[in-house]
Curated annotation (Swiss-Prot):
Pfam families documented for this protein: Phospholip_A2_1
Organism of provenance: Deinagkistrodon acutus (Hundred-pace snake)
Cross-referenced InterPro entries: PLipase_A2, PLipase_A2_Asp_AS, PLipase_A2_dom, PLipase_A2_dom_sf, PLipase_A2_His_AS
Predominant cellular place of this UniProt entry's protein: secreted
Signal peptide: 1-16
Protein name listed in UniProt: Basic phospholipase A2 DAV-N6
The keyword Hydrolase is assigned to this record: yes
Active-site residues per Swiss-Prot or TrEMBL entry: 63, 105
Keywords: Calcium, Disulfide bond, Hydrolase, Lipid degradation, Lipid metabolism, Metal-binding, Neurotoxin, Presynaptic neurotoxin, Secreted, Signal, Toxin
Taxonomic placement: Eukaryota, Metazoa, Chordata, Craniata, Vertebrata
EC number: 3.1.1.4
Cofactors, names only: Ca(2+)
Class in the EC hierarchy, top level: hydrolase
Location of this chain's protein in the cell: Secreted
CDD domains according to UniProt: PLA2c
Length: 138
């Protein structure tokens, strides 16, 4: 279900923030967010609960925590300035919210890139009901 929601959001907001995050993920991993990360493990994609399944899923958990710390921002919808050069993502000048959202996304994309070796296809499209353990705290 969360995968369908992500796809719908991406189709509606083609110029929005989620597409920016997808581009960062593509830069760092050479994989598109959909289908590789939109419903991976217990935390990659919309929402999250339970315990991260591996280091890749932990990147998404930390990203969720980063978003939770932002106050007065709309991290899933705000558009922010950024650039990249030879695989390095640089968050640009913008509002304080834009800078913080960009840094959350940049850190997650870098983390996913650094943990490509932990990526397991068995966690792609992982069903939410299998994420039963008590949720990890931020």
């Amino acid at each position: 279900m969360r995968t369908l929601w992500i796809v719908a959001v991406l189709l509606v907001s083609v110029e929005g923030h989620l597409l920016q995050f997808n581009k960062m993920i593509k830069i760092m991993t050479r994989k598109n967010a959909f289908p590789f990360y939109t419903s991976y493990g217990c935390y990659c994609g919309w929402g999250g609960r339970g315990w991260p399944k591996d280091a890749t899923d932990s990147c998404c958990f930390v990203h969720d925590c980063c978003y939770q710390k932002l106050t007065g921002c709309s991290p899933k919808w705000d558009i922010y300035p950024y650039s990249w050069k030879t695989g390095v993502i640089i968050c640009g000048e913008g509002t304080p919210c834009e800078k913080e959202i960009c840094e959350c996304d940049r850190a997650a994309a870098v983390c996913l890139g650094e943990n490509l070796r932990t990526y397991k296809t068995k966690y792609m499209f992982y069903p939410d009901f299998l994420c039963k353990k008590p949720s990890k705290q931020c």
